[in-house]
Regions:
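Buried hydrophobic core positions in alpha-solenoid tandem helical repeats
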Residues: 40, 89-90, 136, 183, ...
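Secretory targeting and sorting signals
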Residues: 1-25
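Primary recognition of N-terminal secretory signal peptides and signal-anchoring hydrophobic helices
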Residues: 29-46
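Alpha-helical repeat scaffolds
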Residues: 82-91, 126-137, 271
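Intrinsically disordered, low-complexity N-terminal segments that are enriched in acidic
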Residues: 88, 92-100
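An alpha-helical repeat/solenoid feature that recognizes helix-turn-helix modules
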Residues: 26-33, 50-81, 98-129, 146-178, ...
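Short, charged, amphipathic alpha-helices and their helix-cap/turn boundaries
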Residues: 129-142, 177-187, 227-234
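N-terminal low-complexity, Pro/Thr-rich disordered segments
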Residues: 20-29, 328-339
């Protein structure tokens, strides 16, 4: 009988390996922010990246992956996924494929990766073999604009300029005054900010104004930022949402505007924006795999747009601005509690 005990023990151990472990299951949460971040984490390819598919071919989507890093940092959850994402972004071929190489150099990607690296406490002077800070500063023109160096044209805009200021403000040298002045100088007469520089007439844009006001708040230009926030509040829909022009409100614009309003102390409007984002979120009546995701618009969940919508919605749900993102938090990918 005693000789059989090791055999029985071995069989029991083997069976234990076949039983699913509940320890690795995603925890449940009642937090809408955490549920959105958890859903976003589970959409990552191999738990580390996003891809864009064109013509049946998958290409790396560094921009959306960086957005996910920002979302996880804002929610203070899914940090293990943020760690894997930043490691993927720091692969040399992924970094240079985004910021440019061989004479091509892009302001927006440099700024976005620099911000992501700093949020995750990585060395930006050697990220994927690239000095992101030096590379970005090399794109600063005499006017104060950070411009692309490319044979395909200059696609820098209010987004890229704002990201540059937000990223450089975290560095030892800070954001160049000329770059801040340039951005302030693009303000439209109504107080908002346009996406495209130098366009006539000057047309204020929700997404751009949300980004610019955060950059100006971070760099000490509070009066100009507050003027932009006043314009944002003036174009907020009654349901709390924000849209592009006269289009219906959407999660992306509302997420960006919401975080800007929180950062600027416009709490009444910010909470209205958060309420709209919650109304777009898949709740317990939805398919289990979709719960926590944020739909792009009120028309409902669409997997083609939900990933990017959720990434930016998390910013508005959390109320944490880009200037205050900090890596860390819980490692898990929580699911919405429905019991």
């Amino acid at each position: 009988m005693r000789r059989r005990l090791p055999i029985v023990a071995a069989l029991l151990c083997g069976l234990a390996l076949l039983v699913p472990s509940t320890a690795s299951a995603s925890p449940t949460t009642h937090s809408r922010t955490d549920a959105a971040a958890g859903w976003l984490a589970r959409q990552l390819v191999d738990g580390e990246r996003f891809e864009a598919v064109f013509g049946g071919v998958a290409y790396p989507d560094q921009g959306l992956t960086a957005d996910a890093v920002f979302a996880f940092s804002a929610a203070r959850t899914a940090d293990a996924f943020a760690d894997r994402a930043i490691t993927w972004l720091a692969r040399p071929e992924i970094t240079t494929g985004y910021v440019g190489s061989g004479g091509e150099s892009y302001a927006g990607p440099h700024a976005k990766l620099l911000l992501a690296a700093l949020v995750k406490d990585k060395d930006p002077t050697s990220f994927g073999g690239v000095d992101l800070e030096a590379g970005l500063l090399a794109l600063l023109t005499p006017s104060g604009r950070f411009s692309d160096q490319s044979a395909y044209g200059d696609y820098s805009n209010a987004f890229t300029q704002s990201l540059a200021l937000l990223a450089l403000d975290r560095t030892a040298t800070g954001a160049p005054t000329a770059a801040v002045d340039f951005l302030v100088g693009t303000q439209c007469a109504d107080g908002g900010f346009p996406l495209t520089f130098g366009a006539t007439p000057c047309v204020s844009d929700v997404d751009s104004t949300a980004m610019v006001t955060q950059a100006l708040q971070a760099t000490g230009r509070h009066t100009d930022a507050q003027e932009g926030l006043t314009w944002l509040v003036s174009v907020q829909n009654a349901n709390g949402g924000f849209g592009v022009g006269s289009a219906a409100p959407n999660a992306n614009s509302t997420g960006l505007a919401g975080e800007a309003l929180f950062a600027g102390g416009r709490f009444t409007a910010a909470f209205k924006a958060r309420g709209f984002l919650k109304s777009l979120q898949v709740d317990c009546s939805g398919a289990p795999a979709d719960r926590g995701a944020v739909a792009y618009q009120a028309s409902g969940f669409d997997p083609a747009t939900a990933t990017r919508a959720t990434a930016q919605a998390v910013l508005g749900l959390s109320g944490v601005g880009l200037a205050h993102l900090d890596g860390g938090g819980d490692d898990e990918d929580p699911v919405l509690a429905c019991s």
